[in-house]
Every structure is written in structure tokens, then in C-alpha cells.
């Protein structure tokens, strides 16, 4: 019996150890669960705290949004009031400029943005010759944007009407790396021309830029051009600019030409033409767009031999490109031409081809190498044939005139013929492969 009792005690010892081990494991497990539970509670508290912080932040931002919306609404109301005020001043200005019942020949608008010093120089030049004929040519400044120096300078003149184009729509370029300035310029042009043609009801508009000076006969020239455009619907616009108007390539201040290439840089168009262009006006590069055949549709442009505008803007959207070679040497006309006494009938479509073909026909043909030297050694006008754009660019480069083409048309060309002077009086005609046929010249 005693042996059995002893055996039981020995059996109880492992059982006790097993019980103690189990209790320890249970305690350890409970401790782990307790730690995890504590960590979970702590995480929950942290998340709750963060959520409350976010809710507070959202609430603050919502309050700011509401405040900003209120501010925007107030600014919109102020903008409406300012627009009404501007319209009132503009109406008063237009009434003053057109008083006496005389219908203007054309409104003149200077397109400006952020160059107050350039603008001052331009307006000074324009007012010098516009003041005596102000009733015929009401003057406007159209500013794109809110540059305060330009605005203050514009408002300092009581001889003109100020317009401001404020466009807050973001510019999205069609190709990477493009300058947004060209898109903004196109928007500004459309807005300004819409204002002048449709709001102010002008029948013609002359467009200048804020880096131009004008010639003494600038306004008389455009008055004569206006009459010519009324007679001939094949003239899309009249320009005061010649791309090859550098001092060494011009001579005759009385000479005018038709061109298939839109010159720009001081030009006039009619409301009927704008009616056609405004609905499809491009997003950017408006001047090159006007040079596309699909847009000018066979119509042509009047240009002078000697420029009536001078572009002094070395720093602008084109970043001074070609300024020293092509713009700085431009000859600004300094001769007062009595355009009222000039018969411009030769420029109408029915007469000009015959007139111009006569000039080309009389010119002496030259070919081969050393064309510049040959042209200089001949006392008469000369003509040089080119077979394609590559050959034209080579010949133009030798003489130093513009080599550029747009949509198959060289700058200044009429029916593929580019004309310029060499050694003052003599003309050089660069004649395209189809020009002789288009001009009706035989046996040349």
C-alpha cells in the first residue's frame, strides 16, 4: 500500500509540472493578446485622432473655399461694373472722335502687352501724323493682360481710346515646347478686331504693333488703299510693309505692288473680310495662317516698295530673330507722297497682270553662276529664272533677300515673281517655273 502511495506521488509530480507549464503558456498567451489588444486600441485612438485632424482641416479648407467663392463673386460684380464703366467711356470717346458726322476711313489700333517704353515710342510716332487727321482715323490702344505700366501709359493719352483684353483661360499648346505667347497674341487679335468691327461698327481697321514707327504719308497711303480695296474685291488687305524693304533693295517711294504673300506689320482689312475670318480664326500663328492659300483664296495684298512702317522691336515674341539682318536695315519712307493725286488703277486685278508682265518682259535675262556680279554689271533690269524652292533659296541667299516660303509662295512674290532693287534704280526679278505662263509672257 505504501508502495502504491509512493508511486502516485511520483506520478503527481510530472502532472504538477505539466499543469504549471500549461498555466505559464496560458499566461504568456494572454499577455501577448493583451499587448496586441493594447496596440490595437492605441492604433485606433491614433487613427481617430488623425481622422479628427483631417476633418478639422477639411472643415477649415471648406471655409476658405466658401470665402474664396464669396470673394470671386464680389470680384465678378466689380468686373461687371468696371466693364460697364469702360463701355461708357468708350462710347463717349467714340462719340467725340466721330463727332461732326464724318465717317472715319479706318480705326487705328496699336496692339500692346507689356512694353511700356516701346508703346510710348510708337504712340509718339503715330500721333505726330494722326493728330491732323484724327477724325478720319480714331486711335485705339488694345492691351493684352494687366501690365500696370502699359495701362498707365495708355490712359495718360487723351487723344485715344483704351481697351483691355483680360483672358484667364489657360493656354494649351498643340505641340510640346511651343511658346504660349503666340497663342495669347492670336486670342488678343481676335478679341480686338471683334471689338472694333462689331462693337464699334468700324468698316475698316488698321493694325499696328507696339514696336512700330510710321512714315509721314502713312495715313494718306491707307486712304488711297481703302478706295482701291472698295473697287477691287480681289484685294484682301493692304499693308505698309515690304519684307525686302531694306535700304539696299528699294528706291521708289511711289511704287506699289500686288503680292500673293501676306506682309503684315501695319495692315488694313475691311469688315467684310473679318466676317469671313473671325469664325475660323486660328489658335496661334495667325499671320502664317493668313498666308495659307485655303484662307486668302486667290486674293492678293497691296504692299509698297518703300515701307511706311519701321519695326524697332528687337526684343519680342520672336526673340529678336533675324532683327539685325532683316528688320534693322529697313528703309522707312521719308518722302511725303500726295496719294490723292496718284492714279492707282494699274493695281486693280484687270490691269496689274498686264502692267507687271510688261516690267518682267523688258528685263534682261541672266543665268549661270556669279549672278550678283552679272546683275551689278548690267545697266538694265534683269530677270533670273529659278526651277524650284531650293534654287530660289540659293539665289535669294546670294543677293541677301528673304529666302522663306509659306505654302508654296516666296515672301513678297506675285505669281511666283519676287522683285527688288539693286544699286538703287535697277530691278531684279526672280522668276518662278510657272511665272511666265501665269503672266502671259511669250517668247521670253
Swiss-Prot record:
Provide the topology term for how it sits in the membrane: Single-pass type II membrane protein
Q: Which GO terms describe its biological process?
A: hyperosmotic response; N-glycan processing; protein glycosylation
Reported tissue expression: Expressed in roots, stems, leaves and flowers.
Describe the outcome of a gene knockout: Plants have an increased salt-sensitivity resulting in growth inhibition, aberrant root-tip morphology and callose accumulation.
Instruction: List the active-site residues.
Output: 287 (proton acceptor)
A Pfam family reported for this protein in Swiss-Prot or TrEMBL: GNT-I
Segments in the Cytoplasmic topological domain? 1-6
Could you tell me where this protein is found in the cell?
Golgi apparatus membrane
- Which cofactor is recorded for it? Mn(2+)
Which UniProt keywords are listed? Coiled coil, Glycoprotein, Glycosyltransferase, Golgi apparatus, Manganese, Membrane, Metal-binding, Signal-anchor, Transferase, Transmembrane, Transmembrane helix
Q: Does the keyword Cell membrane apply?
A: no
- Mind telling me which InterPro entries this protein's record contains? Glyco_trans_13, Glycosyltransferase_13, Nucleotide-diphossugar_trans
Report the PANTHER family cross-referenced here. ALPHA-1,3-MANNOSYL-GLYCOPROTEIN 2-BETA-N-ACETYLGLUCOSAMINYLTRANSFERASE (PTHR10468:SF0), PROTEIN O-LINKED-MANNOSE BETA-1,2-N-ACETYLGLUCOSAMINYLTRANSFERASE 1/ALPHA-1,3-MANNOSYL-GLYCOPROTEIN 2-BETA-N-ACETYLGLUCOSAMINYLTRANSFERASE (PTHR10468)
Q: What does this protein do?
A: Initiates complex N-linked carbohydrate formation. Essential for the conversion of high-mannose to hybrid and complex N-glycans. Required for normal root growth and morphology.
Protein name as it appears in the record: Alpha-1,3-mannosyl-glycoprotein 2-beta-N-acetylglucosaminyltransferase
Give the organism the record lists. Answer: Arabidopsis thaliana (Mouse-ear cress)
Amino acid at each position: 500500500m505504501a508502495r502504491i502511495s509512493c508511486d502516485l506521488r511520483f506520478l503527481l509530480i510530472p502532472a504538477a509540472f505539466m499543469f504549471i507549464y500549461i498555466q505559464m503558456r496560458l499566461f504568456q498567451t494572454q499577455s501577448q493578446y493583451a499587448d496586441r489588444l493594447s496596440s490595437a486600441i492605441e492604433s485606433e485612438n491614433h487613427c481617430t485622432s488623425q481622422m479628427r485632424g483631417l476633418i478639422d482641416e477639411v472643415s477649415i479648407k471648406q471655409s476658405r473655399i466658401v470665402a474664396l467663392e464669396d470673394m470671386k463673386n464680389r470680384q465678378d460684380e466689380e468686373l461687371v461694373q468696371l466693364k460697364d464703366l469702360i463701355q461708357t467711356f468708350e462710347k463717349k470717346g467714340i462719340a467725340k472722335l466721330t463727332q461732326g458726322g464724318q465717317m472715319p476711313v479706318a480705326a487705328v489700333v496699336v496692339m500692346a502687352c507689356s512694353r511700356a517704353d516701346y508703346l510710348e515710342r510708337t504712340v509718339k510716332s503715330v500721333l505726330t501724323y494722326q493728330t491732323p487727321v484724327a477724325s478720319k482715323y480714331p486711335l485705339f490702344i488694345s492691351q493684352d493682360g494687366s501690365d500696370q505700366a502699359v495701362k498707365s501709359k495708355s490712359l495718360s493719352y487723351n487723344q485715344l481710346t483704351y481697351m483691355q483684353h483680360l483672358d484667364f483661360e489657360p493656354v494649351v499648346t498643340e505641340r510640346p515646347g511651343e511658346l504660349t505667347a503666340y497663342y495669347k497674341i492670336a486670342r488678343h487679335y481676335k478679341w480686338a478686331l471683334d471689338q472694333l468691327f462689331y462693337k464699334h461698327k468700324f468698316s475698316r481697321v488698321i493694325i499696328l504693333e507696339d514696336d512700330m514707327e510710321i512714315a509721314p504719308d502713312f495715313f494718306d497711303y491707307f486712304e488711297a488703299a481703302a478706295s482701291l480695296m472698295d473697287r477691287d474685291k480681289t484685294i484682301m488687305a493692304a499693308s505698309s510693309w515690304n519684307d525686302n524693304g531694306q535700304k539696299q533693295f528699294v528706291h521708289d517711294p511711289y511704287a506699289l505692288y500686288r503680292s500673293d504673300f501676306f506682309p503684315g506689320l501695319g495692315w488694313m482689312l475691311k469688315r467684310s473680310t473679318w466676317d469671313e475670318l473671325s469664325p475660323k480664326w486660328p489658335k496661334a500663328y495667325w499671320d502664317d495662317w493668313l498666308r495659307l492659300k485655303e484662307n486668302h483664296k486667290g486674293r492678293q495684298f497691296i504692299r509698297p516698295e518703300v515701307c511706311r512702317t519701321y519695326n524697332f522691336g528687337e526684343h519680342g515674341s520672336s526673340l529678336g530673330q533675324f532683327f539685325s539682318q532683316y528688320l534693322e536695315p529697313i528703309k522707312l519712307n521719308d518722302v511725303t507722297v500726295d496719294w490723292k493725286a496718284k492714279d492707282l488703277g494699274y493695281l486693280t486685278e484687270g490691269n496689274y497682270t498686264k502692267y507687271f508682265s510688261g516690267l518682267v518682259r523688258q528685263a534682261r535675262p541672266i543665268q549661270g553662276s556669279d549672278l550678283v556680279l552679272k546683275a551689278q554689271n548690267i545697266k538694265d533690269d534683269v530677270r533670273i529664272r529659278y526651277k524650284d524652292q531650293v534654287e530660289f533659296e540659293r539665289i535669294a541667299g546670294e543677293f541677301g533677300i528673304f529666302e522663306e516660303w509659306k505654302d508654296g509662295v516666296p515672301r513678297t512674290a506675285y505669281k511666283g515673281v519676287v522683285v527688288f532693287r539693286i544699286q538703287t534704280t535697277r530691278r531684279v526679278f526672280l522668276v518662278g517655273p510657272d511665272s511666265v505662263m501665269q503672266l502671259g509672257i511669250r517668247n521670253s
